[in-house]
Amino acid sequence: MNMRKLSVVLLALILVGASVFAAGKTEQAATGPVTIKVANYALLESGYEPFWKQVKTNFEAANPDITIEWVTAPYGEIVNQVVNMAGGGNKVDAIFGEIDWVPGLVDAGLAAPVRDILSPAFVDDFYPDVLKSFEVDGKPYGIPLYVSPYVLYYNKNLFKQAGLDPNKPPKTYNEMLSYAEKLSKLKDANGNKVYAFGQTTASVPVSGASLTAMVFNFGGQVLDAQGKLSVDNQGFKDAFAMVKQLDEKGYNPQNAKLKDLRNLFALGQLAMYYDQSWGFNGVKSINADAVNFTASAEPLVGGSGSGQSLLQAHCFILVDNGAARRAALDKFVEFVISEKTLSSYLRDLTPAYPAKKSMASMESVVNNGILKGASPAAGRVQVQPFIPRISDLNLELCALAQAVTVGKQDLNSAIEKFKSTASVKISQ
């Protein structure tokens, strides 16, 4: 898949029709009760559980012949759970997950092209470039509920305490460093250190995706248009030089997962950090007052870059289990990815941008105070080519970040080792 800049913009409302038949399917769905299995780690997360339980209740009330059976496992285990179940002949019908999960599930032979299951009118309502970001061999294999670049969240109260204007967040990495010098001198009410800037580097795939977004900030790349490793560029080197500098100055918590950064931010011990837009729900679930001190800003500009970021999305990855379950799954997906279902979700739980043209003018998005500062970044999103071993690549990026921070390794030497190891991993 070719690299693309992705422009996710708020457009005028477009009304589209709906079809109850999946594209290209002449097989007749059986009548009678149907159960579809949906793998969903969010059922185990307190901030999201009530929403998904209500989705099941409302959908089953509207579709009495269809039953939703949840398959749950923690975030880091749900994909393995799905694959292991399939190996035993028990396949789910959909996986609620992240865009980076798509290539692995396609490679495992589980994911189906979305147009094989969903109605043409429904699929055609999605922004074309968003759908292209889910493509494998020219076909989209995931359907997004909503999308977002990585955004910069910052604590307005800490900015004030440091003598900084809370309405003027940094725009460049150099500005961020000057802000960080002041913010790093603060202590919280209990005398705990305040970290100035958070960039996740822990050994989980999403941390690697976040590091890729940082490379994009600096105008660099990790993979070329053909999906080959391509890190001999200044932007890549500059990004990891920044990771190293943030560590040396003590600004960034070492080996932190996104959930660790969210916890520190919620407790007032982290002034700025990069996150997916929906990460704010994790912050708010820890500290409800976060609504009053949190603001968002565009990704920082570094080196020769323009502050581009990486597209992130929560999506459904679909599995074809025959006509009856396929037809039921079509109804379920269209029920969930609708303004009626997602309006309160995007307003109260997960600030993000709709992926459908007909949902662009939703009040819960247009007037979302948390999203306001980061909104222009939606037009500067760069797509990472899909490769089957994207998770392995992301883990190697984390290992590189840890090598130049915790390991105190020389940057150039660490990059050379990364190139050698990552090349082998992604070619397997």
Mark where each language-model region is:
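Conserved N-terminal structural module of periplasmic/extracytoplasmic solute-binding proteins
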Residues: 4, 8-11, 19-104, 122, ...
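Hinge/lid segment of periplasmic solute-binding proteins
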Residues: 24, 74, 97-151, 177, ...
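Extracytoplasmic/periplasmic substrate-recognition and gating elements
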Residues: 57, 61-62, 162, 237, ...
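Short helix-initiation/N-cap motifs at beta->coil->alpha
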Residues: 72-81, 100, 171-177, 253-267
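Alpha-to-beta junction loops
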Residues: 86-97, 110-111, 267-275
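Extracytoplasmic/periplasmic solute-binding protein
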Residues: 141-145, 150, 160, 175-228, ...
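Glycine-centered hinge/linker elements that transmit conformational signals in sensory
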Residues: 179-182, 225-255
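Long, aromatic- and glycine/proline-rich binding clefts that accommodate carbohydrate-like moieties
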Residues: 297-298, 346-403
